[in-house]
Amino acid sequence: MSSLRTADDTWDIATSVGSTAVMVAASRAAETERDEALIRDPYARLLVTGAGTGIWESVLDAKFVETVAAADAEAAAIFEHMISYQAVRTHFFDAFFTAAAEAGIRQIVILASGLDSRAYRLDWPSGTTVYEIDQPKVLEYKSATLAEHGVEPAATRREVGIDLRHDWPAALRGAGFDPSRPTAWLAEGLLMYLPADAQDRLFEQITELSAPGSRVAAETAGVQAEDRRQQMRERFERIAEKFDMTASLDIQQLIYEDPDRADVADWLDAHGWTATAVSSQQEMRRLDRWALPADLTDDDAFSNFVTAEKQS
């Protein structure tokens, strides 16, 4: 159970779940500026610097990990791993959308889109519409920030400002979504912020809205032991204090670690989809991006990347 969440909580880009989007964008920005980057997101830095979230803006400093390493080598390894994880995750789901577009899908839905910039940075075929669903203030911040810098979407982009715990299918249809057309759906960095029953309901709604040939991709929720969570919390508090950075939000307290959460691939297989799951650890090692020492490796704490296609 999450200790900082309520049944109808809301947020903007600098608070609660909204601020986690800044963390992810900071990692994308850091990755983009590497010589051998897995992904290129030219807009991530813009989105981070205007958000005012302290520690995540610090990640933009090219010397950040090196500086942290001088004080706490293990914390530096964790930060390096976090950046690499986000790069690998982004790379994986970018490829998912590229394959969907090559298969002729022209209707895209990004759930809890946060500061996702794919509508702007991917090479979408003509006729593609990207629907982004998130809290209104989060969507407003992203679109306003990019517009101020003259950045235009690479596809038709439609904002659906609504909480996923409300009637988002009706709002999506109201924005022009056509359930009779195949759709590519993405739930990236989302499921861990939903209770188990809400996760099931989300996939039920996706299934109801999906024509045959639709595709869905999701990052599953990992589970971390409480003692390890506390250890991480204390370490990051020390780092923030030592380097005079704004204390980071305790992301672990925003997450629902429900023990009865359904396995996403199994759920999809049982509801008319054909699913495949790839371990994020496996994908990170395949791309030579694993940064954690062996004593910090916990299989249950890491997510899977699931993709599936609707059969009927």
UniProtKB/Swiss-Prot annotation:
Enzyme class: transferase
Top-level division of the source organism's lineage: Bacteria
GO terms (BP aspect): methylation
EC number, UniProt record: 2.1.1.-
Binding site for S-adenosyl-L-methionine: 134, 163-164
Name this protein carries in UniProt: Putative S-adenosyl-L-methionine-dependent methyltransferase Mkms_0097
Keyword Heme: no
